[in-house]
Amino acid sequence: MIYQVFGPYGSAAINVASCESGLNPGAYNQSGASGVFQIMPGTWAGTSEAGASPFNAYANIVAAHQIFVRDGYSWGEWTCKP
């Protein structure tokens, strides 16, 4: 799914998600970050996927891609970098 959504940035996205959550859609951090890409609730609310669960793998990946594009194709929102 990550390759389908991120296209040419798929490998980098896999690296980020692997580091952030171990590719676990059920991952949760005490900070409130959730899902495959460990997206914070406030950031999640600003995506088109806000009505879905952040633990839905596909929704989390789509939201992460939106954040990535919104930020100028930057991984700045994430602790882990490709």
Predicted regions and their residues:
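Short amphipathic alpha-helical interaction patches enriched in hydrophobic/aromatic residues
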Residues: 25, 47-51
